[in-house]
């Protein structure tokens, strides 16, 4: 098989796995506390990676500068902790009714990344960014509320869930910006291991002072099975597939392949939960995704 085709298929597979996770896996952990869920979602992959290559990566981590470690901490704090806390909370709030909306709103992440890159990294902002950024935000609003005001559609926790999803997109976008500062400091494997290590440590502190660890006794066998499936597939497994695929394709091709995420989210939500987007929501999702693609090409 041609390497370009292989790379595209791997990115498509990773994006589809993330879509399946947001619809079918993580929402079914709703009986547990959110901080505990996020902690375990990072701890299990960390344990697996520690067994496979932990000793080698600890040596690589010791070689990093303090400045690099600070930015790694920021990536773990925003991308690993805050972003994941917000998106898991959003998925739990909607009670399987608006999962597609919550997952699709994450696609606004590049908007926040571009804004933060302008503010923090002083990167130039083209006028076209503003145009497509506005259309993306408009599409996100119509996807969530259609032609209504937020207060009129606040049933089913859609409004707070949407806000949590947007905050997650902002947090993931922040992690992307901070990640730009450390791309040349470590390999992807080292960066992935350190991110999960720091996130697990931060979440341990958060769980200690919030929900506690009582969920270890409350979690059912089904909960632990979902945790293991996520750890091996849609968690670190999907990330590895994604970046392995990126080695063989361009960023523009990857952007198109990532459309498997929203498409699979819609399909899985229909097949598993019986939820269907309205015509207005479908049109809004298309507008938002096209705008994000345009922004990615500009970038």
Swiss-Prot record:
Location relative to the cell: Cell membrane
UniProt-listed PANTHER family: EAMA DOMAIN-CONTAINING PROTEIN, INNER MEMBRANE TRANSPORTER
Family membership noted in the UniProt record: Belongs to the EamA transporter family.
Functional note: Transports riboflavin into the cell.
Transmembrane regions: 7-27, 34-54, 68-88, 101-121, 129-149, 158-178, 202-222, 224-244, 253-273, 276-296
One GO term describing the cellular component: plasma membrane
Keyword field contains Membrane: yes
Induction: Expression is probably regulated by riboflavin, via an FMN riboswitch.
Primary location group: membrane
Keywords, comma-separated and alphabetical: Cell membrane, Membrane, Repeat, Transmembrane, Transmembrane helix, Transport
Domain EamA: 6-144, 162-294
Topological category with respect to the lipid bilayer: Multi-pass membrane protein
Entry protein name: Riboflavin transporter ImpX
């Amino acid at each position: 098989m041609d390497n370009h085709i292989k790379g595209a298929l791997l990115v498509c597979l990773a994006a589809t796995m993330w879509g399946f996770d947001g619809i079918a896996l993580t929402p079914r952990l709703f009986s547990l506390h959110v901080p505990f869920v996020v902690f375990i979602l990072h701890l299990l992959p960390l344990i697996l990676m520690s067994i496979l290559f932990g000793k080698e990566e600890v040596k690589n981590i010791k070689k990093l500068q303090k400045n690099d470690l600070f930015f790694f901490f920021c990536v773990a704090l925003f991308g690993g902790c805050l972003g994941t806390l917000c998106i898991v909370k959003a998925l739990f709030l909607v009670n399987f009714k608006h999962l597609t909306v919550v997952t699709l709103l994450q696609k606004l992440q590049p908007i926040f990344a571009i804004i933060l890159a302008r503010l923090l990294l002083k990167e130039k902002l083209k006028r076209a960014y503003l145009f497509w950024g506005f259309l993306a935000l408009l599409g996100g609003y119509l996807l969530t509320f259609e032609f209504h005001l937020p207060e009129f559609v606040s049933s089913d926790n859609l409004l707070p869930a949407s806000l949590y999803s947007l905050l997650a997109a902002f947090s993931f976008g922040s992690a992307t910006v901070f990640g730009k500062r450390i791309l040349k400091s470590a390999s992807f494997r080292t960066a992935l291991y350190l991110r999960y290590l720091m996130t697990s440590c931060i979440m341990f502190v958060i769980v200690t002072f919030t929900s506690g660890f009582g969920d270890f006794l409350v979690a059912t066998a089904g909960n632990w099975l979902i945790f293991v499936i996520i750890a091996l597939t849609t968690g670190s497994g999907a990330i590895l597939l994604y970046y392995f695929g990126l080695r063989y394709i361009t960023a523009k091709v990857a952007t198109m392949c990532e459309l498997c995420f929203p498409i699979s989210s819609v399909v899985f939500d229909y097949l598993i939960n019986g939820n269907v987007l309205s015509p207005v929501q479908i049109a809004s999702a298309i507008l938002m995704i096209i705008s994000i693609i345009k922004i990615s090409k500009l970038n």
